[in-house]
Amino acid sequence: VTDLLLLHGLTYDHRTWDPVRAELAPGHRVLAPDLPGHGTAPRRASYSLSEVVEVIHARAEAAGLVRPVVAGHSLGAVVATAYAAVHPVSRVVNVDQVLLVGPFGTAVREAVPVLRGPHWRTVWDRMLAGMGIESLPDAARTLVETATDPRPDLLLGYWSEIIERPAEEIEAEAAARLRTITARGAGYHWVTGREPSERYLSWLRAHAPGAAVTVVPGGHFPHLADPARVARIIAG
């Protein structure tokens, strides 16, 4: 039975995977850690992607995971993709995260002065408003609203590379990671909450030709809108 490593999104914690875990067949060894600085995980001075990957890998090794399926939601999918490029995995499941910086990067960079001041929360609230949370079932919506602890140090820390590095550089790295994952024989499955653009699909398949793409309607939280379906995808 496949080992599973489940990584939550920015500001959230391991509880956001509970509905998916409840749908998994027994027998899987599952690790759903809190990302550094989230939940009960210690805060850090830096949340660079490479550091976060190694912290998670240490947890996975300690739990005895062997070539796990690594599933990540949102920022967790960025971590999952980076993880799979440097550590053995059987498959990556990316839940609703495009790997191109695009307009999101522009919005983050423009928001930096506000993020560093007393009104930082307005930036996060504006982003939440576009995530389709209101369309989720009641229990899922409650989970999204409670299994979260936004802080400016988390936002600035995890977005530091978007803030400080050229988008082209970040995107070239993402493409290289996809090619490495493909060369290693690991699968890549993108679960998106909305119909993807042809431009992005072309980019994804240029670097991960065998990538599977599944649309699971549910705004930014398809794993909470339809946990049974996403559990089936993760379990393979």
Where are the model-predicted features located?
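Conserved HGGG/HGGXW glycine-rich cap/lid loop of the alpha/beta-hydrolase fold
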Residues: 1-42
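Active-site loop->helix "elbow" adjoining a glycine-rich segment at hydrolase catalytic centers
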Residues: 12, 74-77
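Active-site loop/oxyanion-hole signature of alpha/beta-hydrolase fold enzymes
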Residues: 22, 31-71, 75, 232
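Hydrolases whose catalytic domains are alpha/beta-hydrolase-1, hotdog thioesterase
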Residues: 79-83
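Flexible "cap/lid" loop of the alpha/beta hydrolase fold
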Residues: 85, 89-124
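Conserved alpha/beta-hydrolase catalytic His-Asp/Glu region
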Residues: 103-105, 121-181
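Conserved serine/cysteine hydrolase catalytic core
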Residues: 152-210, 214-217, 223
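Post-His helix in hydrolase/transferase enzymes
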Residues: 224-235
